[in-house]
Swiss-Prot record:
Required for 5.8S rRNA and tRNA processing; associated with RNase MRP and RNase P. It is found in: Nucleus. The gene is POP4. GO terms for cellular component: nucleolar ribonuclease P complex; ribonuclease MRP complex; ribonuclease P complex. The modification Phosphoserine is found at residue 64. Keywords: Nucleus, Phosphoprotein, rRNA processing, tRNA processing. The keyword Membrane does not apply. Component of nuclear RNase P and RNase MRP complexes. RNase P consists of an RNA moiety and at least 9 protein subunits including POP1, POP3, POP4, POP5, POP6, POP7, POP8, RPP1 and RPR2. RNase MRP complex consists of an RNA moiety and at least 10 protein subunits including POP1, POP3, POP4, POP5, POP6, POP7, POP8, RMP1, RPP1 and SNM1, many of which are shared with the RNase P complex. GO terms for molecular function: ribonuclease P RNA binding; RNA binding; rRNA primary transcript binding. It comes from Saccharomyces cerevisiae (strain ATCC 204508 / S288c). InterPro entries: RNase_P/MRP_Rpp29-subunit (IPR016848), RNase_P/MRP_Rpp29_sf (IPR036980), Rof/RNase_P-like (IPR023534), Rpp29/RNP1 (IPR002730). Pfam families: RNase_P-MRP_p29. This is RNases MRP/P 32.9 kDa subunit.
């Protein structure tokens, strides 16, 4: 600072000090003022961000513990829900089979041969059994309104079959969901199963669980996939009876529908299924 400027001495030191010359005599007052360049506060901002984002070992351990606890809770919930669904399905099937046997016994004891008469009798005399009976009519919308629309959209089926790709359709059918499909057993090692037709209520790993329309009472049957050929039709339009017919080799479908959706089927030897041709 220039000494010729008398503002500091006349205006400041004379009011604050008895001797205005004292700071100059003691060399407490410098002639120049040193100024350093600044970065506009960038360094301080970076330092604050580093302090906020700094993670010590304790914080990392807490985060990992919270993540592991969330994963374990999610896994336990999934296992519990999956277990409960399996238990509920098993109980439903066993309960339906037990009540079906009771109905057949009542029909034999009362010499009832008509289906409507039997249902009317059970509804009046045994309402608890009637409420838990599986009825084929209740599952028909599952086939007509859900599965048919689903499979048509999956295969891109239209009234004009000239643009239909058959090889691509086979690939999609191998990964399709058959819950709600109307299947018919055409060949089987168990001869008593041949000719059975029903709507699939659950596509399990080794069985097609179907509701079958009976002469006296509707039943739920577990049809094994092993050694069985299933057949189904996809109607092209509602105007006529034209449909696409396909067959399922149960031995190649022994996978859950969830696993089959992401599985790529490869060509393999078929000598283990010669009985299909021989029979």
């Amino acid at each position: 600072m220039d000494r010729t400027q008398t503002f500091i001495k006349d205006c400041l030191f004379t009011k604050c000090l008895e001797d205005p010359e004292k700071p100059f005599n003691e060399n407490r007052f410098q002639d120049t003022l040193l100024l350093l360049p600044t970065d506009g506060g960038l360094t301080s901002r970076l330092q604050r961000q580093q302090r906020k984002s700094k993670l010590n070992l304790d914080n990392l351990q807490k985060v990992s513990q919270l993540e592991s606890a969330d994963k374990q809770l999610e896994k336990r919930d999934y296992q519990r829900i999956n277990k409960n669904s399996k238990i509920a399905l098993r109980e439903y099937i066993n309960n339906c089979k037990k009540n079906t046997k009771k109905c057949l016994k009542l029909a034999y004891e009362n010499k009832i041969t008509d289906k409507e008469d039997l249902l009317h009798y059970i509804e009046e005399k045994h309402p608890t059994i009637y409420e838990s009976l599986p009825q084929y009519v209740d599952f028909v919308p599952m086939y007509k309104e859900l599965w048919i629309n689903y499979i048509k959209e999956l295969l891109n089926i239209t009234k004009n079959l000239k643009t239909f790709n058959g090889s691509l359709a086979l690939l999609k059918l191998s990964m399709a969901d058959y819950n709600g499909a109307l299947l018919r057993v055409t060949k089987s090692k168990n001869k008593t199963l041949i000719g059975l037709q029903g709507i699939v209520i659950w596509d399990s790993q080794k069985f097609f669980i179907m509701i079958v329309k009976g002469n006296i009472i509707d039943e739920i049957k577990c049809i094994p996939k092993k050694g069985t050929v299933f057949q189904f039709e996809i109607p092209i339009s509602d105007d006529d009876d034209s449909a696409l017919r396909y067959s399922i080799l149960g031995d190649r479908f022994k996978y859950r529908s969830v696993d089959r959706a992401g599985r790529k089927f490869k060509s393999r030897r078929c000598d283990d299924m010669l009985y299909y041709i021989q029979n």
